[in-house]
């Protein structure tokens, strides 16, 4: 059995519901939990926190993401790093798919650089 796995197209692993949201786990072990979240336009993931650090990447669509009270208008290609317990919410302005990677190993230290702008 290989020590890797490949997902050639993440967008084929979730369906956006007509009204609502869906979460599909792609991988889960003692280190990370990776899930695809699909939202129909107008759906919201209300304010919440995660117990571990996480990365969010918008793969499709547009969203208003609120991080610790600060609103960001984001679209495909946007990438976010959040420390544990950062209050956040996501409002899908259009049909949207987001990849969430939660770091479950509390001993992992993340060094976050400055924001990259082009």
Where are the predicted features?
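A short, N-terminal "cap"/entry segment at the start of jelly-roll beta-barrel domains
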Residues: 1-31, 66, 115-118
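Conserved short histidine dyad/triad with adjacent acidic residue
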Residues: 20, 33-50
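Structural motif
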Residues: 33, 62-64, 71, 87, ...
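Short, conserved beta-strand element in jelly-roll/cupin
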Residues: 38-40, 49-65
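Short beta-strand His + acidic residue motifs that chelate non-heme Fe in jelly-roll/DSBH
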Residues: 45-47, 65-66, 82, 87-93
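A cytosolic small-molecule/anion-sensing beta-strand core signal
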Residues: 59-60, 75-76, 94
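Short acidic-glycine-tyrosine-enriched beta hairpin
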Residues: 69-84
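Ligand-binding loop in jelly-roll beta-barrel domains
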Residues: 84-108
């Amino acid at each position: 059995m290989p020590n890797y796995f490949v997902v050639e197209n993440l967008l084929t692993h979730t369906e956006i519901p007509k009204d609502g949201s869906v979460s599909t786990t792609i991988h889960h072990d003692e280190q990370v939990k990776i899930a695809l979240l699909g939202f129909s336009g107008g759906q919201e993931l209300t304010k919440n926190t995660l117990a571990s650090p996480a990365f969010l990447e918008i793969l499709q669509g547009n969203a208003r993401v609120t991080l610790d009270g600060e609103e960001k208008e984001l679209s495909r290609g946007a990438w976010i790093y959040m420390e544990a317990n950062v209050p956040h919410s996501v409002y899908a302005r259009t049909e949207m798919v987001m990849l969430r990677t939660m770091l479950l190993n509390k001993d992992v230290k993340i060094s976050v650089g400055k924001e990259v702008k082009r």
